[in-house]
UniProtKB/Swiss-Prot annotation:
List of residues that carry Phosphoserine: 99
Keyword vocabulary terms for this entry: Isomerase, Methylation, Phosphoprotein
A Pfam family annotated for this UniProt entry: Rib_5-P_isom_A
Family: Belongs to the ribose 5-phosphate isomerase family.
Organs and tissues of expression: Widely expressed, with highest levels in testis.
Residues with PTM Omega-N-methylarginine: 52
UniProt-recorded Gene Ontology molecular function terms: identical protein binding; monosaccharide binding; ribose-5-phosphate isomerase activity
Gene Ontology biological process terms, A to Z: pentose-phosphate shunt; pentose-phosphate shunt, non-oxidative branch
Bias type Gly residues, positions: 22-33
Name of the protein: Ribose-5-phosphate isomerase
Length: 303
């Protein structure tokens, strides 16, 4: 019997068409310059019309439709390859968030029907929960299944050491929880997400989930200590900031140089008011990149 998920009391089994990602949002513009040396903090201003995360959307100056079509095909190819290689019967699966994971869930559902697989799925967001329900998969949570066999998720950027930036869709904390309690964490992405260094291709910053009352002091602390710009992420289809599934705000830290990411991640997480960061350091075991030529490039964690 399927156990109701954590959102059942508030939302019920809502099977409406899925959004491309939870809490679609844009970076906040305008605001005050705090005058910090070598850095500044953006307070919320008018929201830009900019699609975030790995959804592949863009503003008027974005990629041509042909490029986007190739990227979508690449996502699908990477997702299906990862599912074929790693999903097995009697597993507890962590289901990530975003547009790439849609292809993975579709293939998982096909295999469940074709092979009569017995799988249990743990969502990383409201969007992931609805996706699991839409495709008729078995929904559960960490209360019932605290040990996860395999987590599959996308990424906004992957560096040469398989460090990740995640959280463009605002689900970073629950994504990190699920990945952290999984025996194996596999990432699926398209060719645009493959970088030598974090920040080479992803220019929207590292997301930081914060308690709402602390967003200003956290913004100042991060900018003062590490430089760059810190912005409160503003919503597109609502007035005010993006609110996560956990009821928190998101800051986007646009760093201006390469850092020792493990040290930076620890330091930011120790800042009072910070819930977690979108830096996934030393967590991914393998990344599947769908390429423009129809191939899949598989990179494993260096030892």
């Amino acid at each position: 019997m399927q156990r109701p998920g954590p959102f059942s009391t508030l939302y019920g089994r809502v099977l409406a068409p899925l959004p491309g990602r939870a809490g679609g949002a844009a970076s906040g513009g305008g605001g005050n310059n705090w005058g910090l040396s070598g850095s500044h903090v953006q307070l919320p201003g008018r929201a830009h019309s900019e699609t975030r995360g790995d959804k592949g959307g863009s503003s008027a100056g974005g990629p041509a439709p042909s490029t986007m079509s190739k990227a979508e095909e690449a996502k699908k190819l990477a997702s299906h390859t990862a599912v074929e290689n790693h999903v097995k019967n009697n597993q507890v699966l962590g289901i990530g968030s975003g547009s790439t994971i849609v292809h993975a869930v579709q293939r998982i559902a096909e295999r469940v029907k074709q092979e009569n697989l017995d799988l249990i799925c743990i969502p990383t967001s409201f969007q992931a929960r609805q996706l699991i329900l839409q495709y008729g998969l078995t929904l559960s949570d960490l209360d019932q299944h605290p040990e996860i066999d395999l987590a599959i998720d996308g990424a906004d950027e992957v560096d040469a050491e398989l460090n990740l930036i995640k959280g463009g869709g605002g689900c970073l904390t629950q994504e990190k929880i699920v990945a952290g309690y999984a025996s194996r964490f596999i990432v699926i992405a398209d060719f645009r997400k493959d970088s030598k260094n974090l920040g080479d291709r992803w220019h929207k910053g590292i997301p930081i989930e914060v308690i709402p009352m602390a967003y200003v002091p956290v913004s100042r602390a991060v900018a003062q200590k590490f430089g760059g710009e810190v912005e409160l992420r503003m919503a597109v289809n609502k007035a005010g900031p993006v609110v996560t599934d956990n009821g928190n705000f998101i800051l986007d830290w646009k760093f201006d140089r390469v850092h020792k990411w493990s040290e930076v991640n620890t330091a930011i997480k120790m800042t009072p008011g910070v819930v977690d960061t979108g830096l996934f350091i030393n967590m991914a075991e393998r990344v599947y990149f769908g390429m423009q030529d129809g191939s899949v490039n598989v990179r494993e964690k260096p030892f």
